C-alpha cells in the first residue's frame, strides 16, 4: 500500500471521530437538537415494481438487464442455467460508475433475487473487473426478479431503493412488486462525510465504517449488537496498527463487525 498503515489508521480514526460530521440545511433548531434528531432516523419503505423471470424447467436462459434512471448508461445480462436442484447465475454489467457516485455512504453493488411472493434473497456483491462488474451465484429459487442496488456494505439485509439495474420486461417475465428501503439510510438533506477511498483501504474496512455510522444514525449505539460490533471495530484498528497491515483475519473481523452493526440497526428500526 502506498501509505503506511499508521497513516491509514490515523486517518481512519479521524473518520471515526467524525461519524456525526454532516451537512444539513440550516434550521432554527440548535446543532445538538438536529444531531439528536438525526441519530434517531427511522427509515421507511417504498414499493417498487419488478419483473420476475419465468425460466424454462431445464436448459438456460439469458435475460437483459437495463440501467435505471440512476444509471442510464448501464447495461448487462444474467445467464440462468437451470439445474435439477438449483439455478446457476452468471451476471455481468458495464456502464456503472463507482457506488460512491451516488453518495459517500455507498461502497458496493449488491444483486438481489425477489420472488413473486415478495421474498428477497441476496445473491451477492458484484465484483469490479476492469470497467465491468461481475457476479456468479446460485439460487434454490427458480423464478425471481433480479435487481442490482447501490449499498453501503454487503451485509445489508434489505435492498435500498437505489436500484441501478433491473430486468427488462419481456415475454418471459411477469410483474411483481417489493418494498425497498427508502432514503439512502439518512434523512433528506443529510450528507455523510466522505471516506478516503483513494488511500488504498480494503473495501471491508470502508464497509465496516459505513455500517457503524449508519447504525449510529439509527440510534443503535446502546444495544448489545452495536457493542459487539464496536469491540470488533476497535480490535480491527488496533490489530492493523500493530501488524502494519490488514491481514485476512483482520478483514474477517471487519466483516463480522459490519454484521453486528447491521443487526443493531435492524433491531432499532425494525426494517
Locations of the language-model features?
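Bacterial N-terminal signal peptides
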Residues: 10-20
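Surface-exposed loop/edge segments in extracytoplasmic proteins
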Residues: 117-125
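Short beta-strands and strand-coil junctions in structured, solvent-facing domains, enriched
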Residues: 97-101, 119-120, 154-157, 239
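Exposed aromatic-hydrophobic patches
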Residues: 90-93, 98-99, 130-139
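Noncatalytic modules at the cell exterior or secretory-pathway interfaces
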Residues: 140-147
Amino acid at each position: 500500500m502506498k501509505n503506511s498503515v499508521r497513516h491509514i489508521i490515523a486517518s481512519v480514526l479521524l473518520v471515526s471521530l467524525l461519524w456525526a460530521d454532516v451537512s444539513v440545511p440550516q434550521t432554527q433548531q440548535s446543532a445538538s437538537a438536529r444531531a439528536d434528531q438525526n441519530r434517531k432516523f427511522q427509515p421507511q419503505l417504498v414499493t417498487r415494481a419488478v419483473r420476475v423471470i419465468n425460466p424454462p424447467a431445464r436448459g438456460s436462459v439469458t435475460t437483459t438487464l437495463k440501467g435505471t434512471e440512476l444509471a442510464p448508461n448501464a447495461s448487462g445480462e444474467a445467464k440462468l442455467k437451470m439445474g435439477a436442484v438449483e439455478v446457476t447465475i452468471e451476471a455481468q454489467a458495464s456502464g456503472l460508475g463507482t457506488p460512491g457516485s451516488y453518495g459517500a455512504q455507498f461502497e458496493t453493488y449488491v444483486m438481489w433475487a425477489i420472488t413473486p411472493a415478495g421474498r428477497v434473497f441476496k445473491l451477492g456483491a458484484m465484483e469490479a473487473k476492469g470497467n465491468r462488474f461481475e457476479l456468479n451465484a446460485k439460487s434454490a429459487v427458480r423464478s425471481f426478479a433480479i435487481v442490482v442496488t447501490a449499498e453501503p456494505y454487503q451485509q445489508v439485509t434489505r435492498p435500498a431503493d437505489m436500484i441501478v439495474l433491473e430486468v427488462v420486461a419481456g415475454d418471459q417475465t411477469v410483474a411483481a412488486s417489493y418494498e425497498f428501503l427508502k432514503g439512502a439510510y439518512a434523512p433528506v438533506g443529510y450528507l455523510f462525510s466522505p471516506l478516503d477511498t483513494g488511500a488504498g483501504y480494503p473495501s471491508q474496512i470502508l464497509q465496516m465504517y459505513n455500517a457503524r455510522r449508519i447504525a449510529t444514525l439509527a440510534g443503535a449505539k446502546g444495544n448489545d449488537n452495536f457493542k459487539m460490533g464496536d469491540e470488533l471495530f476497535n480490535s480491527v484498528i488496533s490489530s492493523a496498527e500493530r501488524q502494519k497491515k490488514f491481514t485476512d483475519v483482520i478483514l474477517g473481523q471487519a466483516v463480522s463487525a459490519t454484521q453486528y452493526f447491521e443487526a443493531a440497526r435492524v433491531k432499532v428500526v425494525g426494517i
